[in-house]
Amino acid sequence: MTIERVGLVVHGGREGAAEAAREVREWCDENAVACTDIDVWSDTGRHSAREEVDAAGDPDLVVTLGGDGTFLRGARLAAENDALILGVDLGRVGFLTEVPAPAVRSALDAVRDGGLEPESRMLLTLRASRLLEIPAEMEALLRYGRGPLLPPPRVRTDCESGDEWGIALNVTALNDVVLEKLSRDRQISVGVYIAGRLLASYSADALLVATPTGSTAYSFAAGGPVVSPRAEALVFTAVAPHMTFDRSVVTAPDEPVGLRILERSGRAAVSIDGQLRGVLDPGDWLGVYAAPRRLRAVRLGPMDFYGRLRERMRLTDAPAAVADGTPAPLWPVSTPPPGDLAHLALPVPGAEGASGDLLREQS
């Protein structure tokens, strides 16, 4: 593909970030590609994704240097501009970043030469009963986490708004949308609707709706299922619900999840991909659903999601199982699969993938 401008998002606190950023800038100079730093960590002002993308000159490739948190901040910008995103891994327990720092030049070469197929990831978006805002008197109390508070999401001008369908917000989430309590001594009470039908009224510390990508983040920590990022689904999970039913619910991608704060509940904070975006009052509601746009992420080869799951979650074999034998490959990978298996996602004989090739080049 033709790369005309790179937007560079750097987590300066990560070891190796400065060197990796220098490599990206040098590559851009050598290839006559404009490169603009996008500071998502500064607390000197609040900018919408559109404003940040415009200031960076509408990059067609966003490169993030850091961990999953840095990738999420870059994804917010890439989704706004329909740009590709390339995550360089400088983190510790990441599922989103793809490229080890020593391979960043090779990865950029591969993107430039068009030898890679972007991976499409589901995004979430919102409708709400009103605009999301953070009350001025509560702002100081709600400044948790790293990075600046973001401005309230704007209204989407290309969508009908008002009446019983609420306001369409110009915001996307790659991981999750979370509704959480503001008071330490009181849970929030929320009516949960799936595909327009009441599932149940919950009293919980938080309620979240995750994408398959986000299933290994907060949803996983709250007891939710691990979902392949290739799947098309929404995952609803309650955090510390005060009720017998404490299971997650996995919905189809065309089944929206509605969250209405009950009239005598406390207020609730709304976080999108870990960043606080507003506070809702009793009677307010959110509708969370699959966005029409997708995130296009650079993938260097077929993703070994389950190998990464085993590695990053430090999965170990049950001692009783180990005592009973050593697992062997279920199917051989030295020959092509038979016809009835040809449509399945299975290893291809002799094709380790571009990711392995890049790693070997750096060794």
From Swiss-Prot:
EC number(s) stated in the UniProt entry for this protein: 2.7.1.23
Recorded family membership: Belongs to the NAD kinase family.
Function: Involved in the regulation of the intracellular balance of NAD and NADP, and is a key enzyme in the biosynthesis of NADP. Catalyzes specifically the phosphorylation on 2'-hydroxyl of the adenosine moiety of NAD to yield NADP.
Family matches, as InterPro entries: ATP-NAD_kinase_N, ATP-NAD_kinase_PpnK-typ_C, NAD/diacylglycerol_kinase_sf, NADK
Keywords associated with the record: ATP-binding, Cytoplasm, Kinase, NAD, NADP, Nucleotide-binding, Transferase
Catalytic residues of the enzyme: D68
Protein name, as recorded: NAD kinase 1
Pfam family, one: NAD_kinase_C
GO terms, biological process: NAD metabolic process; NADP biosynthetic process
Name of the coding gene: nadK1
Record field: catalytic activity: NAD(+) + ATP = ADP + NADP(+) + H(+)
Localization (cell): Cytoplasm
Chain positions recorded as NAD(+) binding sites: D68, G69, R73, N175, D176, R186, D205, A240, Q275
Top EC class, one word: transferase
Co-factor requirement: a divalent metal cation
Leader sequence segment: none
GO cellular component assignments: cytoplasm
